[in-house]
Amino acid sequence: MTKLIIHLVSDSSVQTAKYTANSALAQFTSVKPKLYHWPMIRNLELLNEVLSKIEYKHGIVLYTIADQELRKTLTKFCYELKIPCISVIGKIIKEMSVFSGIEIEKEQNYNYKFDKTYFDTLNAIDYAIRHDDGQMLNELLEADIILIGPSRTSKTPTSVFLAYNGLKAANIPYVYNCPFPDFIEKDIDQLVVGLVINPNRLIEIREARLNLLQINENKSYTDFNIVQKECLEVRKICDQRNWPVIDVSTRSIEETAALIMRIYYNRKNKYNK
């Protein structure tokens, strides 16, 4: 494995640089990365501290810094060390300015912008928490997305991930031989997505969960036939109503959420035409 050091430097949380780095690293299976996070770098004193760390451990520098003087100092330093220094969104900002004819604002305001998007995200997170695991079914019509699936198919973390993207997601577990909420018999506008998983993989996850909780008596929870029937029944429910089904066996939460968002926005764009 080839070791690769990456310094993420930002005047905010470094999340943009981090996501970009991880997306790029996914293309290199033989690389063993070491990421150093340097958030909230907003003055020369803090930047100089980071520069000393970079000098000690050479590596690629990815940055998102708005202040022009700090950017110049960082790029000049890296140039002298002969190490790559890449602005994550600099090219995007420049192209936006050229295309729109609007000059880039020189002054950076570090006060967070509490706009509609911010409050929509907060509301979506609150909604996901209150409507987790089949709670408050009387408010399902407020949801953007409803997830259904057997227990431990990543419904909760997927709901939260969707919430961080401003989408209200409720999730409802399907349990074998238990009545499902009557909302499935109604013609609803919300996007309903079924989550299923390979039964053997689901049993592994459930067994690990039971061991963590030190529970040894719930045999039906890990019974192959029951687990298989739960997944098949969810598929059947969704197929009968033309609801999409996603197999999460080999997907990360981010991938599952991205697929759901693609379905949601394709559907929304279609209805808005």
UniProtKB/Swiss-Prot annotation:
Matches recorded under Pfam families: Kinase-PPPase
Keywords, ordered alphabetically: Kinase, Nucleotide-binding, Serine/threonine-protein kinase, Transferase
Annotated EC: 2.7.11.32, 2.7.4.27
Catalysis performed (reactions): N(tele)-phospho-L-histidyl/L-threonyl-[pyruvate, phosphate dikinase] + ADP = N(tele)-phospho-L-histidyl/O-phospho-L-threonyl-[pyruvate, phosphate dikinase] + AMP + H(+); N(tele)-phospho-L-histidyl/O-phospho-L-threonyl-[pyruvate, phosphate dikinase] + phosphate + H(+) = N(tele)-phospho-L-histidyl/L-threonyl-[pyruvate, phosphate dikinase] + diphosphate
Superkingdom of source: Bacteria
EC supergroup of this enzyme: transferase
Entry binding sites for ADP: G149, P150, S151, R152, T153, S154, K155, T156
Single GO term (MF): phosphotransferase activity, phosphate group as acceptor
Segments passing through the bilayer: none
SS bond partners: none
Family annotation (InterPro entries): Kinase-pyrophosphorylase (IPR005177), PPDK_reg (IPR026565)
Cited NCBIfam families: PRK05339.1
Family assignment from sequence similarity: Belongs to the pyruvate, phosphate/water dikinase regulatory protein family. PDRP subfamily.
Function text: Bifunctional serine/threonine kinase and phosphorylase involved in the regulation of the pyruvate, phosphate dikinase (PPDK) by catalyzing its phosphorylation/dephosphorylation.
Protein name, UniProt field: Putative pyruvate, phosphate dikinase regulatory protein
Organism for this UniProt entry: Rickettsia africae (strain ESF-5)
